[in-house]
């Protein structure tokens, strides 16, 4: 059985403290994540079934942990839409892996979590902590938002898991933020208390989209046909790419490329559009992605300002790693800095792209091992 050690060599572990230190985004100064239950483990070993449960897929994993080390020992991926509930996915995992007997379950879920109860934003699922206990017999269950799990997952990342989009200014400590466009749009913060960072969830992706130009207003009015409220998720999540493309055809009267339209019938339209934009083979696709990247830059700026995220912003989710060439073009950075009188602050903030798509699953594992122990 292959075991993956999730204890990068640049972590500095003091058994007397329940924090993990990792490399700063800008230089060799350190930032830290708080795990208050870790010191309570001592030499005890715990087995955690951890999961990242989203609208498209669910990544499940087994972690084994002591106070000094956490190991990833098994992973499986499932298509969420093919199952009626997360319980069925967990049961499928246990059927496929009968040799594991976890004593706790920790799930990062794509939706708001209240008192052990969560509704998946882009699936007709309700996840209930009590139901999981009843169905599995496992008493220690945690449900956290998937972006909060992503933030905790930073503890298990190495330098190779990041791509610097903007280096910012070195040596600045402070709050941090995570923004993740995928099936939906997730946002989270990490509060800096002067010693360690504490991740927390938000639902900022559902805040109102703000229009600045006539083009923005036209797109807003077009989207209102399908959305009661046009949110930031309406313009910078996966489905938004196809919506923006159709807006350009129907409202802006851009010429339709029949080859692109045929590809939509057998492939994910958003992927077709972004790939054509990167390749430079279709002008309408290129224009659609310019809209998308512009709005992504603006919302990154918004999140930095609202969190006062001087410690850095992590760009996560399924889409950014697939459009790296577009993020390296001037449009993203120009819109990142295009704010009201706070350009000097935003310019100092490091921005990194998180390349490891298992970060939410890993974060759920670390939370289950080292935070749930304090409950």
What are these regions (language model features)?
Residues 6, 10-101, 218-375:
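ATP-binding/phosphotransfer module of carbohydrate and carboxylate kinases, centering on a glycine-rich
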Residues 27-43, 143-176:
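Conserved phosphate-binding catalytic cores of ATP/NTP-utilizing and phosphoryl-transfer enzymes
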Residues 122-123, 142-149, 168-171, 178-181, ...:
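Active-site nucleophile and cofactor-binding loops and adjacent substrate-binding regions
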Residues 97-143, 151-161, 178, 322-325:
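Short beta-strand-loop/turn "lid" adjacent to the catalytic site in phosphate-handling enzymes
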Residues 58, 112-114, 184-188, 243, ...:
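Short, acidic Gly/Pro/Ser/Thr-rich loop/turn segments
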Residues 161-233, 238, 331-337, 341-343:
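Glycine-rich phosphate-binding loop of actin/hexokinase-like ATP-binding domains
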Residues 107-111, 181-183, 310-320:
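Glycine-rich beta-strand-to-loop/alpha-helix junction loops that act as flexible
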């Amino acid at each position: 059985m292959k075991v993956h050690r999730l204890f990068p060599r640049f972590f500095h572990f003091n058994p007397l403290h329940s924090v993990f230190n990792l490399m700063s985004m800008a230089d060799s100064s350190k930032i830290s994540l708080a795990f208050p239950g870790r010191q309570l483990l001592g030499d005890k070993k715990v087995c955690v079934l951890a999961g990242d449960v989203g609208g498209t897929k669910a990544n499940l994993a087994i972690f084994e942990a002591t106070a000094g080390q956490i190991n990833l020992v098994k992973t499986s991926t499932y298509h969420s839409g093919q199952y009626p509930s997360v319980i069925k996915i967990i049961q499928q995992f246990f059927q496929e892996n009968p040799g594991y007997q976890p004593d706790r379950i920790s799930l990062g879920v794509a939706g708001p979590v209240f008192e052990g109860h969560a509704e998946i934003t882009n699936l007709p699922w309700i996840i209930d902590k009590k139901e999981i206990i009843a169905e599995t017999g496992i008493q220690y269950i945690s449900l956290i938002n998937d972006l909060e799990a992503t933030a905790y997952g930073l503890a298990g990342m190495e330098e190779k898991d990041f791509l610097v989009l903007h280096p910012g200014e070195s040596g600045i400590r402070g709050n941090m933020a995570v923004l993740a466009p995928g099936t939906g749009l997730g946002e989270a913060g990490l509060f800096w208390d002067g010693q360690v960072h504490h991740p927390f969830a938000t639902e900022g992706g559902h805040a109102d989209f703000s229009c600045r130009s006539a083009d923005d207003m036209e797109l807003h009015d077009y989207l209102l046909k399908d959305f009661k409220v046009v949110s930031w998720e309406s313009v910078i999540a996966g489905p938004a790419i196809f919506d923006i493309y159709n807006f350009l055809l129907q409202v802006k009267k851009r010429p339709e490329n029949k080859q692109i339209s045929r590809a939509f019938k057998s492939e994910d339209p958003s992927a077709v559009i972004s790939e054509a934009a990167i390749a430079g083979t279709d002008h309408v696709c290129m224009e659609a992605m310019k809209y998308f990247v512009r709005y992504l830059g603006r919302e990154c700026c918004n999140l930095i300002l609202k969190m006062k995220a001087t410690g850095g912003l992590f760009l996560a989710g399924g889409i950014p790693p697939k459009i790296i060439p577009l993020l390296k073009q001037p449009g993203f950075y120009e819109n990142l800095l295009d704010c009201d009188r706070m350009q000097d602050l935003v310019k100092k903030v490091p921005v990194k792209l998180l390349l490891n798509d298992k970060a939410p699953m890993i974060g759920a594992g670390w939370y289950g091992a080292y935070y749930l122990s304090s409950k």
